[in-house]
Amino acid sequence: MLSFSHVFDAPLEQVWSVVGTVDRVDWVPGVAACDLQAGVRTLNLPGAGEIQERIIERDEENYFLRYQCIESPIPLEFHEARMQLTRESPNQCCLTWEAEIQPASFESFLQESMSGALAQLITVVEAEASK
């Protein structure tokens, strides 16, 4: 299992407004567009195809999101991820992002993708905080 965490110098609600809006993709590198239909988001990756992810759980009160890849241009057997935000203080929160993937040979690819997305998420949240 892959696991990342990051403490944001931003209110929990501000970070949730980005990651909890499941069709918002400005923080996901390589994704040009997202279409959300009946709990399934389709991510368009120019030059790579489309990825479909089923939103399994989105808990607005506990700031928790769980999703599973159901269609991918790479031959995945299983991919599920969880994002949890916890309040550290009124103006700080911690994001914990965990993911499982099979076959395990794709783990390094997923780790690189998640690292890039986390870096972009930090940039987006910081830009919104400075508005």
Over which residues does each language-model region extend?
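Short, solvent-exposed secondary-structure boundary/capping segments
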Residues: 62-70
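Intrinsic-disorder/low-complexity, polar/charged segments enriched in Ser/Thr/Lys/Arg/Asp/Glu/Gln
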Residues: 1-5, 40, 50, 78-80, ...
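Short aromatic-glycine motifs in intrinsically disordered, low-complexity regions
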Residues: 39-46, 71
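Hydrophobic pocket/interface hotspot
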Residues: 15-19, 25, 41, 55, ...
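Hydrophobic ligand-binding cavity/cleft-lining segments
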Residues: 1-35
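Beta-strand/loop substructures that line and gate deep hydrophobic ligand-binding cavities in soluble
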Residues: 71-124, 128-131
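A short, structured loop/turn motif at beta-sheet edges
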Residues: 12-13, 56-62, 85-94
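Hydrophobic/aromatic beta-strand elements that line small-molecule binding cavities or substrate pockets
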Residues: 6, 51-57, 69, 79-87
